[in-house]
């Protein structure tokens, strides 16, 4: 009933923090499953049936990777583990007091088989063969991440132009200015 009457639906998603067997994130708790819990994906699918804009706020120590979330959520706010001031920061973003301008500090895999996933990591066992013999991707998915390092949206629009670097080549310990 509440979803039917709402203009927008905000869903809180993520893992259960802790140190015991009931936790799905926390110190020393690892998982090979990188999607949302199945019950949360079912909840998203049920809420999507009402055809209202859905915003997901994701609380976890790892980024969200979910086909269901990708397909049905209008926006995802990656809150990580926000601590004491997190609630105020999230409310300020939702009400437009501040603009969500953060960028992802990691690339987010589509599925666990892509991990590790970063910009210059060789892909699979045939990566050295390239596209010349048909091994350009995994069998089930491409090599592209769900969300790339640095991905993020904002309420505003930004344009970068006339970008220049101070040196065309740098050594590993040198700095450049952009």
PLM region spans:
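Hydrophobic helix-and-loop "lid/oligomerization" segment in the mid-to-C-terminal part
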Residues: 1-71
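Secreted, periplasmic, or luminal enzymes acting at the cell surface/secretory milieu
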Residues: 59-178
């Amino acid at each position: 009933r509440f979803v039917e009457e709402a203009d927008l639906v905000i869903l809180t998603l993520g893992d259960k923090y802790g140190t015991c067997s009931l936790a799905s994130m926390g110190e020393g708790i690892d998982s090979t499953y990188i999607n949302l819990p199945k019950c949360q994906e079912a909840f998203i699918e049920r809420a999507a049936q009402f055809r209202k804009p859905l915003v997901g706020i994701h609380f976890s120590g790892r980024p969200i990777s979910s086909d269901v979330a990708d397909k049905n959520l209008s926006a995802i706010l990656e809150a990580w583990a926000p601590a004491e001031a997190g609630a105020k920061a999230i409310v300020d973003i939702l009400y437009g007091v501040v603009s969500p301008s953060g960028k992802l500090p990691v690339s987010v895999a589509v599925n666990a088989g892509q991990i590790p996933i970063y910009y210059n990591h060789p892909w699979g066992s045939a990566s050295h063969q390239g596209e010349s013999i048909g091994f350009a991707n995994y069998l089930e998915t491409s090599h592209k991440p769900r969300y790339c390092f640095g991905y993020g949206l904002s309420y505003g629009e930004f344009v970068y132009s006339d970008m220049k670097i101070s040196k065309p080549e740098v050594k590993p310990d040198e700095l450049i200015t952009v």
